[in-house]
Amino acid sequence: MSPQTETKASVGFKAGVKDYKLTYYTPQYKPLDTDILAAFRVTPQPGVPSEEAGAAVAAESSTGTWTTVWTDGLTSLDRYKGRCYHIDPVPGEENQYICYVAYPLDLFEEGSVTNMFTSIVGNVFGFKALRALRLEDLRVPISYIKTFQGPPHGIQVERDKLNKYGRPLLGCTIKPKLGLSAKNYGRAVYECLRGGLDFTKDDENVNSQPFMRWRDRFLFCAEALFKSQAETGEIKGHYLNATAGTCEEMMKRAVFARELGAPIVMHDYLTGGFTANTTLAHYCRDNGLLLHIHRAMHAVIDMQKNHGMQFRVLAKALRLSGGDHIHAGTVVGKLEGERDITLGFVDLLRDDHTEIDPDRGIYFTQSWVSTPGVLPVASGGIHVWHMPALTEIFGDDSVLQFGGGTLGHPWGNAPGAVANRVALEACVQARNEGRDLAREGATIIREASKWSPELAAACEVWKEIKFEFPAVDILDKKKS
C-alpha cells in the first residue's frame, strides 16, 4: 500500500491535522493516460513550502480537507485523491511555482464541464495558505473527451452550410449595443449584410430589455436576413442571442429562431453557465443551428497573470461544452491579448492535436480525436487598417468582426460593410499571390482603396487609430 494512503483499516484512525504533503505530494507518481492533468501557477504565503502549497491544491480540489476524518477509512484515497506530482519554479519570480496535479477520472461526472470545474477550480481558490492561484492549462484525456458532444457542427460543416471557402468570414456587432428599437436594429442588420458581410451579431448584453423585446428583434432580424440574401445571392446570418434568465426561456428563444429559419443563435457561455451552454449546444446539433459563443465576463477570470484561470482553459472547456464560434481577442485591437498566447489557444480551438509549446503557453499535449473545431472570432476595436494583420494572424478559419469599424463609416452602414469586404478580399488575394501581409499590409490596403471609394473613406477616418497598450497576461521569462 502506498505510503501516502492512511486508512482506518490499515493503520487505525488518528484524529488531528497533518501536512497535506504527507498524502498529496507524490513526486514518484507517473500520470495515467486517463488522468485529467492541471498546471497551476501557485504563489504560497510566506513560510509555506512549495511542496505543501502544491499538495494543498491537489487535496482541496479532490478528496482532502483541513483535518483527518474517520470516513477516510471507508474508501481508498489512493484511488480517488488528486496528486501534485511535479513542481517547477517560475523563472524570474521569487516565490511562484507551476504545480502539476493529476486527477483520477473517476472524480468527474461524464459530459459535465460544470462538475469538472466545480472540483478543479472550486473552493481551492480561496485557500488561505496561498497568496494567489491560477489554473494555466488542463490536459483532458481522450476517454473523458468522448463523453462530450462538443461543438454542434464545427468548421467544415459551417463552411458547407454557408458555401463560403478560402477566406475568413466577416461579421459586425450592431451598435449602439443598447437602446435601438427592434425595427431600427433590423435596418442596421440589413444594411450591413447587404453591403457584403457574412454575419451580424447581437451584442452580449442584448437579451430582452424594455426598449427591444427578444421576439421583436428576432422577427426584424429574420426579415433583414432573408431580404439581404435575396439581393446578394449569398447565405447570411445574424447571431440571435438566446441568453436568458432561465434555461427554459433560453430554449424557447432558440426554438423560435429555428422556426424563423435563422441559421445561427448565440449564447453568453460564462454568464449563462456551462450547464445551459451544453443544453443549447445539444439542441443546436439536433436542429441544424450553428452556435456563436460570446465570452462576456472572461476578463474577470483570466486577465490577471497570477490569479484566476488562463483563457486557454476556458477555450478547452467551451470546445467540450459546445460552440461553433468563440471570441478569442484580436492581438491588434482594443482588447487584451498577447500574440503568442492568443495563437496558442486559437490552435487549441481549431486543431485536432496540439503539442506542448512553452512559446505559446501550452503546458500539455492535447488530442481532440473526432471533436469538431471551433472558429475563433477576432472582435473589438478593429478597422480596415487591421485587416492585413488579422488575416495573417488568424488565417482563413476565423471570423473577423468589425462593429464600430463597420457602423462608424462616414457614409453609413452598407458602405462600411463594403469597405471591410473589399479590404478582406484584397488581403486574401495578395496572400494567395505570395505577398507578405505583415510587411506589405498598408500598401495592399492603399492599392485596394484606389478602386473602392468606400474603402478609401474608411482608411481616412481610421488612419490614426491604434490601441498600443502592453498586454497584462504575458509569457514567463525564459530560463537563461
UniProtKB/Swiss-Prot annotation:
GO terms for biological process: photorespiration; reductive pentose-phosphate cycle. The disulfide bond which can form in the large chain dimeric partners within the hexadecamer appears to be associated with oxidative stress and protein turnover. It is found in: Plastid, Chloroplast. The modification N6-carboxylysine is found at K201. The modification N-acetylproline is found at P3. It catalyses: 2 (2R)-3-phosphoglycerate + 2 H(+) = D-ribulose 1,5-bisphosphate + CO2 + H2O; D-ribulose 1,5-bisphosphate + O2 = 2-phosphoglycolate + (2R)-3-phosphoglycerate + 2 H(+). Its EC number is 4.1.1.39. Substrate binds at N123, T173, K177, R295, H327, S379. SUPFAM superfamilies: RuBisCo, C-terminal domain, RuBisCO, large subunit, small (N-terminal) domain. Keywords: Acetylation, Calvin cycle, Carbon dioxide fixation, Chloroplast, Disulfide bond, Lyase, Magnesium, Metal-binding, Methylation, Monooxygenase, Oxidoreductase, Photorespiration, Photosynthesis, Plastid. The record marks K334 as: Transition state stabilizer. It holds the Pfam family RuBisCO_large_N. Binds 1 Mg(2+) ion per subunit. Its cofactor is Mg(2+). Residues 1-2 form a propeptide. It comes from the Eukaryota. GO terms for cellular component: chloroplast. The active site is at K175, H294. The basic functional RuBisCO is composed of a large chain homodimer in a 'head-to-tail' conformation. In form I RuBisCO this homodimer is arranged in a barrel-like tetramer with the small subunits forming a tetrameric 'cap' on each end of the 'barrel'. Heterohexadecamer of 8 large chains and 8 small chains; disulfide-linked. The disulfide link is formed within the large subunit homodimers. RuBisCO catalyzes two reactions: the carboxylation of D-ribulose 1,5-bisphosphate, the primary event in carbon dioxide fixation, as well as the oxidative fragmentation of the pentose substrate in the photorespiration process. Both reactions occur simultaneously and in competition at the same active site. Belongs to the RuBisCO large chain family. Type I subfamily. This is Ribulose bisphosphate carboxylase large chain. The gene is rbcL.
